[in-house]
Amino acid sequence: MSKNYYITTPIYYPSAKPHMGHAYSSIIADFFARFKKIDGYNVYFLTGTDEHGLKIQRSAEKLDKDPKEFCDEISKTFEDLTKTLNLSNNDFIRTTEDRHKVSVQNLWNILENNKQIYLSKYSGWYSVSDEAFYNEDEVEEKDGSKVSMSSGSIVEWVEEESFFFKLSEWEKPLLDFYEQNKNFILPESRRNEVISFVKSGLKDLSVSRKTFSWGVKVPTDDNHVVYVWLDALTNYLSSLKYPCLLYTSDAADE
């Protein structure tokens, strides 16, 4: 029986049309997908677009367009790129699709039912373009605005109610898993980097937003939308028909 091999590109953020960097990532993934097929593996190759969030909402507003209309137009250019490059992908997923929404909300319910999610408040410096929060020592004053020292992007002070994932509880289980599965992260230099990061201490992760509406609604509180950490990342499961997992009878071996 052939082993299963699952390979993905990052799902691309369609705030603008694709450029050479998107082609570069896609071609590398396609190379490995084709090589593994030749090597006898049952390959599933995924690419797609991450279409939710404040950045998309604001980009659409600037053009006086509905966010879905904006995403439909830009996402098509990414899907067209897969044909231009003659990629061998099995699927092109969009996080605005119903199949993805079902997966995200199912995963949310599992986490909430297992007491891995709680409601609290978050405050900090937020960059819309980076979709990231920064600590006080990571921002500086420049030309009258606060900016991220690492990216140079303008940041805004944000205070809001948010649901949090108890990531801090997973520090030891993750380290144990990495120790028992030494080839899980490759190359070794990256494995060491990840282990060092986890050992430095994990903080609970903000996984919802109330300050914008363009996203998958939290199933138990429609005042919140699911944030990127649980929305976009779940695409790697939703393409495999999670929670049904109908694509194959067993999980990917690699």
Regions picked out by a protein language model, each given a short descriptive name:
Residues 62, 108, 137-138, 204:
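Alpha-helix boundary/capping detector
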Residues 2-119:
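N-terminal Rossmann-like or analogous alpha/beta NTP/dinucleotide-binding catalytic cores
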Residues 2-47, 99-103, 147-249:
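Structured secondary-structure scaffolds
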Residues 116-163:
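Cys/His-rich short segments
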Residues 250-254:
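A short, hydrophobic C-terminal helix/tail in secreted or cell-surface proteins
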Residues 56, 60, 127, 134, ...:
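Short clusters of hydrophobic/aromatic residues that line enzyme substrate/ligand-binding pockets
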Residues 57-58, 104-105, 130-132, 138-140, ...:
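Short acidic, glycine/serine/threonine-rich loops at helix termini
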